[in-house]
């Protein structure tokens, strides 16, 4: 983790860091190229995507950034038919409220004031609680960060060397980090796992700089992707999920973002991993052992009949505790 040594003002390192950032900005491509989606035949199964966003009365301390309620159980059913999607279809079909939508507002088992359950088989929100209300996504943001990175990875540098300035800022902001150190050079794969499993803001900002030159330019790519996916009530200003009044979504649209994220094999693998060890570096000769903030909490408390295939937790004081997850019935 980060230690107090980052409080020491290191003039030369800051100058080097700024010079490196300037070079990265100069190299930044003129414009983000959208990746064409290859839509293939998929087995049609009912997917449950649940968003939890704890109310202000349930907020935890800043030390519990990724804590979340684990008492929502999604009951659904599986279908064995297959469907063929034509390549002309949009990358994401905007979900509608199901005719038999179940309002969970009076469900005392669900502590969260916000929830959405999306059946990706028919693009319907089948249950929820203020499912179209504005919420702050906190680190659920990193699902969109992962999407944008994965679709720009061929145009990015393949490694990043961490500098003093960024790590020091994140330390002061008390952001959750993967634990990469000043001078450490890390590849894209390790950064992706560092982004998702421990919810590393260090990895998020590194990937943003690699893909776009800065957090601000990366946020533009995030918003372009939202527009491409047809999202109406989602906007991003940073890749980490740190609170910003202009960074928001809804439970329904966050579920749709997760649906899209899981369409890609690489993203699905990262979002569905419990533990991962980064490659050896001079700073970490044995690598860093990363553990999923989601899987570590649901381990031993799994909902019967449901297999969680991936997910991402979040926490800020303003957002409360939150979770987006993707599950299939395993009957």
What are these regions (language model features)?
Residues 1-35:
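N-terminal Lys/Arg-rich, disordered targeting/topogenic segments
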Residues 34-37, 89-91:
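A sequence/structural signal for flexible, mid-protein segments enriched
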Residues 38-52:
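Hydrophobic membrane-insertion alpha-helices, especially the h-region
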Residues 51-69:
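Sec-dependent signal peptide cleavage junction
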Residues 71-77, 85-252, 261-265, 329:
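Active-site-adjacent loops and short helices of periplasmic peptidoglycan-processing enzymes
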Residues 231-232, 243-248, 252-331:
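Domain-terminus/edge residues, biased toward the C-terminal soluble/receptor-binding domains
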């Amino acid at each position: 983790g980060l230690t107090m040594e980052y409080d020491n003002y290191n003039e030369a390192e800051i100058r080097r860091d700024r010079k490196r950032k300037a070079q990265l900005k100069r190299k930044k491509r003129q414009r983000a190229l959208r990746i064409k989606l290859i839509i293939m035949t998929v087995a049609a199964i009912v997917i449950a995507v649940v968003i939890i966003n704890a109310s202000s009365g349930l907020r935890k301390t800043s030390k519990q950034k990724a804590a979340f309620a684990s008492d929502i159980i999604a009951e659904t059913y599986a279908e064995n038919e297959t469907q063929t999607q034509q390549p002309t279809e949009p990358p994401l079909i905007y979900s509608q409220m199901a005719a038999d939508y179940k309002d969970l507002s009076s469900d005392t088992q669900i502590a969260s004031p916000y929830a959405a359950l999306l059946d990706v088989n028919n693009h319907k929100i089948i249950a929820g609680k203020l499912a179209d209300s504005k919420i702050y996504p906190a680190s659920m943001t990193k699902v969109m960060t992962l999407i944008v990175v994965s679709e720009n990875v061929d145009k990015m540098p393949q490694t990043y060397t961490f500098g003093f300035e960024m790590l020091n800022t994140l330390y002061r902001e008390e952001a959750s980090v993967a634990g990469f150190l000043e001078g450490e050079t890390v590849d894209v794969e390790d950064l992706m796992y560092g982004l998702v499993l421990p919810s590393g803001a260090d990895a998020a900002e590194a990937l943003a700089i690699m893909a776009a030159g800065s957090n601000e330019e990366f946020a533009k790519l995030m918003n372009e992707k939202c527009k491409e996916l047809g999202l109406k009530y989602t906007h991003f200003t940073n890749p980490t999920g740190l609170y910003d009044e202009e960074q928001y979504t809804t439970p329904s649209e966050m579920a749709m973002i997760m649906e899209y994220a899981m369409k890609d094999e690489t993203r699905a693998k990262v979002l569905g991993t419990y533990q991962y060890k980064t490659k050896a570096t001079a700073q970490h000769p044995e690598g860093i052992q990363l553990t999923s903030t989601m899987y570590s909490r649901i381990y031993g408390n799994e909902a019967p009949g449901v297999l969680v295939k991936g997910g991402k937790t979040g926490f800020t004081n303003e957002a409360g505790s939150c979770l987006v997850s993707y599950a299939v019935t395993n009957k």
